[in-house]
Amino acid sequence: MPLRPSKEPYRNNVAAFFENLLPDNRQILERIQRRFGVPSVNAFDLLSQIGRDCVGALQLLPEDQEPPNVKQITSKKLSSEQVAELLSQTVGNPLAGGMDSDEPLRISLAGAQEKTALLLRNGSWRLPTGSTPTTHILKLPLGVNPQGIDLSSSVENEWLCSEIVKGYGLPVAGCTIETFGEFKVLVVERFDRRLSSDRKWYMRLPQEDFCQACGIPPALKYENDGGPGILRIMEMLIGSEQAEQDRRQFMRAQVIFWLLAAIDGHAKNFSIFLLPGGSYRLTPCYDVLSAYPVMGHGRGKLAPEKIRMAMAVHGKNRHYRWKEIQARHWIETARRCGIAEMRSVIEEVITTTPQVIRHAQSQIPKGFPDLIADSVFDGLNAAAKQLRNDLAKP
């Protein structure tokens, strides 16, 4: 949202832009409201208190506050035990300052799960102060959702999916599995932060997700609910400064997400970097989670025939159901987006799959849950085989 020369205020879609900076989980929003004593869960009320470290380059402060100098690094060193204490407070109080601090951690992270963020500096974890941004997000396990689906191994699941996506050659946010006390977390390196060339301060890099780019509120992030789908995002990427590369990358990501049964690839899980002069380009992938470990029938399982992708592919009709999608639907969807070589993209992904699996298997640490690894690798193999058979049909 560039500043208008006339200083005329934005209306309508501006609320959606700011709503997308916040967690899209009502319970988390209500806990933030209670923690800071704001009158509502309205985005502007919440961001007036927690907007000091938003996704991208934004810093939002109360009207009477001046931002401290951004070109310096100020922080408090944390022990492993203190990080564990901070994590223990995150579930009950997602933005607690923790320890002996009277100052809450005023960060805003989008998404639906419990998480916090810290600064990693010279190998030590630190609580940023002043205008110093966080550099890493610490994501806790999702646990059991209201439908009884057990996502307690989401940390391992997301780590493995990231390794697989990286193996296919797609850029993806770097992540590791770390343990602090009783808490296992996925530590994700923020790609909207960069150390300055003189190594004296951390830069915030402007970015926005595709809900923000389209003026869509987070409640409508799925295409079936009115959010952007493949066709709309591919149209927007025509304007990317590296349009051919980004459009091919996005379509490859869609196929790989289907292979992984990564069914939550909605518009908030794809973003663009905002560059000087009004340019933009696609960011790395992030938040990739496979449904294979919870597929099945009965309580606490997702029936494969009912699973839906976040974005539709096209044939004579739109297809969301994971089980119904075939290679021809990807080819037709790409054709509508002006990409003629989708068949070769699919063939490349299929051919690469065995090598990707072998590499990911070699990276698995000791104690990694067999259910996650076996179900994801078996599912990936089966889906690649299906695509191969689809391409062989006349």
Where do the model's predicted regions map?
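Phosphate/dinucleotide-binding and metal-coordinating scaffold of catalytic cores
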Residues: 1-394
